[in-house]
Amino acid sequence: MIKDIISSVNPYLEKKMLITLSMGFVSGVPLLLTITLLQAWLTDEGVSKSTIGLFALVGLPYSLKFLWAPIFDHITLSKLGRRRSWLIVTQILLIITIVSLGMANPSMNAMNVAILATLVAFSSASQDIVIDAYRRESLTDEEQTIGASSYVLGYRIGALAAGAGGLILADYLSYQMVYVFMSSVMFYGLFITFIAEEPKHNNQPSSFVAAVYNPFIEFFNRHVSLSIPVLILLFILLYKI
């Protein structure tokens, strides 16, 4: 029995699965910084409930990320490879935007906070795009299930750390310091990106049509009823708002 347990756990302890787990973790942190922790901060600063309600729109980049996702398929920034180079860019952007958000003053300028929170969400959504592509290309078809489980576990841990962990820290530190502390998590993300290997099967689409239009049409052609793909797309668009 013990051997069976060990054999079932071993795949999760492989290097690429631990990297997938870590990428899930750094992907889960920014989301709660713009939702749970930000709402608590706004409430403590006396921002009106109607204004706080409008901050739900900050999550729109997560739903609209398909608009700029093709950029990450067509442009390679450095010799590190297409996926890792974009991961570094998005993680540096997250560090800058999270720190900037923490330095803002909600009671003095809520609009400035909203803009910075949207930039955090944009950087986070962009990181999610690249991580999803990296995971799909670096794992074999047989490893996708374990990889997805590892990613979701890491994502939940990251979200818990940013949400519950951030609120606990806010009892002892200022919100500014909490955001600065949370931004340091992205340095762990940079470390993971540097030790990760660029996917070997990394074929770049020949054109925008091949990358976006053809897969989109093929997705609709799979289903007899138009309502099924429409419902799937609506779920993808709305589930993080």
Predicted regions mapped to residue ranges:
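Transmembrane alpha-helix termini and helix-breaking/packing motifs in multi-pass membrane transporters
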Residues: 70-75, 102-103, 160-180
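Glycine-rich segments within core transmembrane alpha-helices of 12-TM secondary carriers
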Residues: 61-66, 143-170
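Cytoplasmic helix-loop-helix junction between adjacent transmembrane helices
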Residues: 119-154
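C-terminal ends and interior cores of transmembrane alpha-helices
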Residues: 87-108
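Flexible cytoplasmic inter-helical loops of multi-pass small-molecule transporters
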Residues: 195-217
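Helix-loop boundary and gating motifs at the non-cytosolic
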Residues: 2-62, 228-235, 239-241
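Symmetry-related core transmembrane helices of the 12-TM Major Facilitator Superfamily/SLC fold
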Residues: 89-96, 176-195
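Cytoplasmic membrane-interface "Motif A"-like loop-to-helix N-cap segments
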Residues: 74-91
